[in-house]
């Protein structure tokens, strides 16, 4: 049972947090901020220090090649350096933008956002905005624009749930063959991901996953019932 002071604290916390429709009015997502997806990508690249560092090296090498194009020996060395730098740039870009953020507190934050806000439709924009701010404040991303839109955030959440659930199902179905598995194959999830993770071994996190999954399904069902009130949707 909560004490009067605890009840007061809960009420104050609730009052301090703006409601979803008020947040939505001030939500600034990349799809609303940038004129195109290309301009968004260029902005992200410009604020990623490792990528900008590699670009500066490549531009410098190109300038040196133009400057010393009459010197064959120097040109060969510079061209080889340019090739290596270009390959390094691709690796850095793939590592930076191709790898999903899987920091545990970030995933907990996302699950709790879904549980608390019961998002559907445009409400995912609010969740995306809050997650973008969280990632930026925690220095897990270079800009406050990780999720391009609410749709992208919803897709990330759906992928997270699928990976965790598919891992759970594969774990339970393979218990009988556990003794014959190699340590390497036993440690992998679908798609070779090792990291949807410690979630399955953490009962609290799994409880969040199950709760968020249930609430998201209910929110989606309610959303479509409101969109089509005469359709008698289940």
Swiss-Prot record:
Residues in the Cytoplasmic compartment per record: 1-47, 98-234
Keywords: Endosome, Golgi apparatus, Isopeptide bond, Membrane, Transmembrane, Transmembrane helix, Ubl conjugation, Vacuole
Membrane topology designation: Multi-pass membrane protein
UniProt-annotated stretches for the region Required for resistance to killer toxin K28, a protein-toxin encoded by the M28 virus: 68-75, 147-234
InterPro entries reported in the protein's UniProt record: DUP/COS
Compartments, as annotated in UniProt: Vacuole membrane; Golgi apparatus, trans-Golgi network membrane; Endosome membrane
Biased composition (Polar residues): 177-187
Annotated region described as Disordered, given as residue ranges: 168-187
Linked residues for Glycyl lysine isopeptide (Lys-Gly) (interchain with G-Cter in ubiquitin): 217
GO biological process: cellular response to toxic substance
UniProt note: phenotype after gene disruption: Sensitive to K28 protein encoded by the M28 virus. Cells lacking all 10 proteins of the DUP240 multigene family show no obvious alterations in mating, sporulation and cell growth.
Transmembrane segments: 48-68, 77-97
Disulfide bonds: none
Location, primary (coarse class): membrane
Its job: Confers resistance to killer toxin K28, a protein-toxin encoded by the M28 virus that uses S.cerevisiae as a host. Probably acts against K28 after endocytosis of the protein-toxin.
Note: Present with 1835 molecules/cell in log phase SD medium.
Name of the featured protein: Protein-toxin resistance protein KTD1
Organism whose genome encodes this protein: Saccharomyces cerevisiae (strain ATCC 204508 / S288c) (Baker's yeast)
Taxonomic placement: Eukaryota, Fungi, Dikarya, Ascomycota, Saccharomycotina
């Amino acid at each position: 049972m909560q004490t009067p002071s605890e009840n007061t604290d809960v009420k104050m916390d609730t009052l301090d947090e703006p409601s979803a429709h008020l947040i939505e009015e001030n939500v600034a997502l990349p799809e609303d901020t940038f004129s195109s997806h290309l301009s968004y990508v260029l902005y992200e690249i410009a604020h990623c220090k490792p990528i900008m560092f590699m670009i500066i090296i490549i531009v410098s090498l190109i300038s040196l090649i133009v400057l010393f194009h009459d010197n064959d020996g120097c040109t060969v060395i510079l061209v080889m350096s340019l090739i290596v730098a270009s390959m390094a740039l691709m690796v850095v870009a793939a590592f930076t933008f191709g790898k999903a953020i899987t920091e545990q507190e970030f995933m907990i934050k996302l699950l709790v956002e879904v549980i608390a806000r019961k998002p559907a439709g445009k409400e995912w924009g609010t969740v995306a905005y809050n997650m973008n701010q969280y990632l930026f404040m925690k220095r897990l991303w270079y800009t406050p624009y990780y999720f391009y839109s609410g749709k992208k955030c919803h897709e990330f959440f759906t992928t997270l749930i699928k990976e965790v659930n598919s891992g759970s199902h594969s774990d339970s179905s393979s218990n009988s063959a556990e003794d014959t598995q190699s340590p390497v194959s036993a440690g992998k999830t679908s798609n070779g991901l090792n990291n949807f993770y410690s979630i399955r071994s953490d009962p609290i996190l799994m409880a969040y996953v199950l709760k968020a999954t249930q609430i998201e399904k209910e929110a989606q069902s309610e959303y479509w019932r409101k969109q089509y009130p005469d359709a008698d949707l289940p």
